[in-house]
Amino acid sequence: MTAAHADLQAEFLEMPEGLRIDRPDVADGSALWRIAKDSKTLDLNSSYSYLLWCRDFAGTTAVARAADGTPVGFITAYVRPERPHTLLVWQVAVDAAYRGRGLAARMLDGLTARVTDEYGVTGIETTISPGNTASERLFTSYAQRHGADLEREVLFEAGLFPDAPHDPEVLYRIGPLSH
């Protein structure tokens, strides 16, 4: 880990108001499911899938916790098997009571600092439905903060989704990230 990444991780692991970012525990799965459900913007996965995320992908997932340890936000992500230097960010959500504080950006910065060191990640990908301006701003500003290129292309057309109507999913590809 470089000194710059250590400083970045320290800055984002402990935050004002007693908030902190760390890895999830399996016991956090139900809280992540609730936060996703309450977001009203994410495609809600089964409660079982959030338990699996917290068990199998804890190394590439971040949870923001209130001072009492309660999860108040999360990012689920995984390293793509066919592109082992690419982190795919699956979902980003922050509890309504904690929005507007830059928590999503801090989680994304902290998580990517960790995975670039631990997994050798050099780029991130995510998909965003058109009109999800909060996610568009989050990932566009991330690329700008890190001096990385940002490319966009439609990954999945609307017609591919069996549960119509569904907007197309636009792939955001950000990189290269510096180690």
Swiss-Prot record:
CDD domains in the cross-refs: NAT_SF
Keywords, alphabetical: Acyltransferase, Transferase
Claim: tRNA-binding is one of the keywords in the record: no
Keyword field contains Membrane: no
Family matches, as PROSITE patterns: GNAT (PS51186)
Top-level EC class as recorded in UniProt: transferase
Record-linked InterPro entries: Acyl_CoA_acyltransferase, Ectoine_EctA, GNAT_dom
Residue ranges constituting the N-acetyltransferase domain according to the UniProt record: 19-174
GO BP annotations listed: ectoine biosynthetic process
EC number: 2.3.1.178
Gene Ontology molecular function: any one: diaminobutyrate acetyltransferase activity
Pathway(s) it belongs to: Amine and polyamine biosynthesis; ectoine biosynthesis; L-ectoine from L-aspartate 4-semialdehyde: step 2/3
Family assignment from sequence similarity: Belongs to the acetyltransferase family. EctA subfamily.
Protein name: L-2,4-diaminobutyric acid acetyltransferase
Species classification: Bacteria, Bacillati, Actinomycetota, Actinomycetes, Kitasatosporales
